[in-house]
């Protein structure tokens, strides 16, 4: 029997070594919930044992049931006729298996029938499901919709929807993109209007809506007449109904198991969720940041699957009387794939930990229970999560695409054929650095935190760990890179040139990532010596890359800004 948790040494290491004690204490309100709910942990050891147990269950479902069904789901997919989407029977069975395991309300409060697990543990589930079938994650992961209602909805909305999500009776969709407005969400035009009784209705179109056949939708709509920017947008809850028409499902390159739909709203009854005018500014940005973490996990899951297929094939395929993994050209590729995969996972769960701490301390603030220290931590983790989330999505999704690409290369011609899984991983990975914000938009989201040095406190904390010998030498290399990073940030700031700033932004974000992830991997090597080779390879490779980019920015070459049309239009 395959178990995608127990067979993943790195994932098990992460759960048992990442510091979640503070996270769980906040999540369980100092374990007071144990007095009221039977499934609430009594202490941290109890919580960790519970996380291990549930992750093992999801790992077994993912490895033993979902993955063997994935080829058929990919080949046949959902069907669409007369405005009705019908999911493949195996997709329906996958969702039933997860529902029966009680993991459809992973992060929801105990009082709504949820598990009240941290984002970090839930993300481990989404990684495993994605490794088994990336398209299923696009349905399973939309339980984030329930979490958004929990954060911003009123008590009546919570009572109406959240228990149904926890029981697996309801599924969700987030309806943001329109035919003319994708990244430019502040310009969406779908109209929300009220009748004389105060009832809201929605009119317009949405496109590229994942699981648009869902029972519950969160919709970004323009509630304020005469507005054209983000301040005129509100968030609404609506339900599947005859007035909400699925016009078609898209014919996609990958993630075939989930329906991506075009929706038409014909006076769809809706409820305002939260406050008017805050739809994009607060609620949808929160929803999208949660989705960006989920897509990062999806990317890591695909990368894990692709790496394993490549490693297995290379260890079995013989050429010139030896297996091809004995050739430097191949084992160097496999090594690079493994280093990048481990790096992406390390950043993913450092990010989710920051998100968990942000959520925990902000909850104290909202409940009026926060001390001055708690309020300071809430502000700190707001800043950290805001920069790590886009950094993480950029890294994980680009790594996933590269690993899927290399997995086909290692397979050679056979990898190009549908007989092998790697061609599906390549197709599925391709969307990850596009939806929920392209890599280019993740750079826009992250660059402010990089310029403001939001990661410096955490870097200082890791740099102070008791490294010795070769580890201390690598730490010093990272610190030297951090000093240069501070120098280059000041250089770009002092130029006061917006075009130059935007031109070098991706380099700056990726340079920051090299440093931060290098420290994460070095930190983990203190807990497991066998991880040291990965940390060393990552730091040495990226030291060279860092210096190359540093020199390029310091050269202040603006020729591309001046002659871009000459090149593009040639």
Predicted regions, residues:
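C-terminal helix-coil-helix/basic helical segment that borders enzyme active sites and/or dimer interfaces
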Residues: 342-393, 489-503, 522-526
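A short core secondary-structure module
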Residues: 199, 203-244
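A glycine-rich, basic-preceded beta-loop-alpha segment at the flavin cofactor/substrate interface
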Residues: 241-242, 247, 252, 259-291, ...
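N-terminal leader/propeptide and maturation segments of large enzyme subunits in energy/redox metabolism
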Residues: 21-60, 149-154, 331, 335-348, ...
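Internal helix-loop-helix
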Residues: 59-60, 90-159, 163, 167, ...
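Alpha-helix capping/hinge segments and adjacent helical runs
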Residues: 2-5, 10, 17-21, 255, ...
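Extended, charge-enriched "interface" segments that sit outside catalytic cores
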Residues: 1-81, 85
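C-terminal amphipathic alpha-helical interaction region
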Residues: 453, 465-570
